[in-house]
Amino acid sequence: MQIHHESLSDVERYLSKREKIPLAHKEEDFRNILRCIGFVSGIDGSTEMLEIGTGTGWFPILCRLNGLSCKGMEISPQLVECARRIGESHGIDAGIELGNIEQADLGHEQYDVIIANFVFEHVQDWRQALRRVYEALKPNGVLLFQSTNKFSVISGEFAKMPFYGWLPNPIRYRVRMLFHGRDIMKLGIDFNQFTYLGLRKTFKTLGFRRVVDRVDLADRSSIESAIKRGTLRLCDRSQFVREAVLLFFEVTTFVCVK
């Protein structure tokens, strides 16, 4: 991965869909992220947070508007500038720097929380990047990780094609270049389609002492379906059932504690 200063088509598509979304429309997503982190750790004004891959910057901006401390790192100069404009329109500095997670020095034991919200699918050397994240977390620090799930029937990366994530990498790349142009390989391509089993193993190998998945994080108080509640109870009792259910989820979601 490299930082590209020229205009890229995937960034333009992203901005055309998301740049004008009001911050108020992201409040539910913001609260859900805080809820997931809060499942394993408290958050207050002294909590040092970093978001990798900020997009339009809505999460760090909402943090600052709510008295929380969150820096951001984004590889796209266009998106950094977009976040700056949105922050200024709300009277704050978005606090987002241009950087490449594959190369950036995140420091040693600097952060209480690091958020990687649908970004690692785009990180070519993702294992090296995860090691940097692990080193940058303080003891008992928290990583919130959300990304692709290879065996999802519909992938958010390319929803037009069912079973897109099941395709071998070279074929996926060709499909995306056919529809979105060759510069998708500069920024926007999903180099990685993850699985729950594979990520769980990777997080534990890195040294995370606690790895919590989407089943654990489910907001059970808001689930009305008896079938869904029953399925969650089965997942609690059987690791086999849990892995079978998670296999086809649309995304992978983990909260990991160092």
Report each predicted region and the residues it spans.
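A C-terminal cap/extension of S-adenosyl-L-methionine-dependent methyltransferases
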Residues: 179-180, 185-258
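Short aromatic-enriched loop/helix-cap "lid" or pocket-rim segments at secondary-structure transitions
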Residues: 59, 154-159, 222-227
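A short hydrophobic/small-residue beta-strand
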Residues: 70, 143-144
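Conserved N-terminal segment of class I S-adenosyl-L-methionine
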Residues: 1-109, 113, 117, 130, ...
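Conserved class I S-adenosyl-L-methionine
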Residues: 144-173
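Short catalytic micro-motifs in class I SAM-dependent methyltransferases
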Residues: 118-122
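A short glycine-rich, Lys/Arg-flanked "PGG" loop and its adjoining helix->strand segment in the class I
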Residues: 127-142
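Conserved catalytic-core motifs of eukaryotic protein kinase domains, centered on the activation segment
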Residues: 125-126, 156
